Amino acid sequence: MSKKLIGLAGKAGAGKDTVADYLWEKEGAIKIAFADALRAAGASIFGLDPRNFLDRDLKEAEVEYWGMTPRRMLQLLGTEATKSVFGDDIWLKRWFLSYSAVQDTDHVVVPDVRFDVEAEAIRHLGGTIIHIVRPGVGLDGDSATHVSEAGIEFRFGDMHLSNSGSVEELHHKVDRLWETIK
């Protein structure tokens, strides 16, 4: 069995984490997000429980003290506050440290490909990008217009996954895609 590196792209609520969790359960894929280190930094800086940056409901609820949602905190910390100083690839470089440390595993899934530079790195490492599309999902307000929500370009070799049914239907589609990925 060959090692697989899968990057998942799509709007908020499209099913990226659902697919990543399923690949962990079914195939033993290790989940390494580009935002793992960012979430840890955000929890420390803003004094919040890390779950505020993971739980869908919590990350959309405004934190009165800061006057914004945890999602917005990470958007601003992850781009405006760091990329101008450390470069556009700061989170990619940090992700690569984590990815390199677990190369003894067979499969790795990245549930949060938000920028073309991230997708290119995964492709360069021999990985596959899966674009997950689910009708009627996405963000509202300031979070929706942030550059991290713009999506990435579909390239030759990328795959498309439509998530318009039940979780069981999604799992079945993932199983079929998994078999075609080399």
Give, region by region, the residue ranges found by the protein language model.
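Hydrophobic anchor at the beta1->P-loop junction of P-loop NTPases
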Residues: L8, V110
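Post-Walker A helix-loop "phosphate-sensing" segment adjacent to the P-loop in P-loop NTPases
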Residues: E25-I32
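Short, well-ordered beta-strand core segments
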Residues: K31, V108, I129, H160-L161
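Conserved lysine of the Walker
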Residues: K16
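Hydrophobic positions on the alpha1 helix immediately C-terminal to the Walker A/P-loop
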Residues: V19
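Extreme N-terminal starter segment of soluble prokaryotic enzymes
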Residues: S2-I6
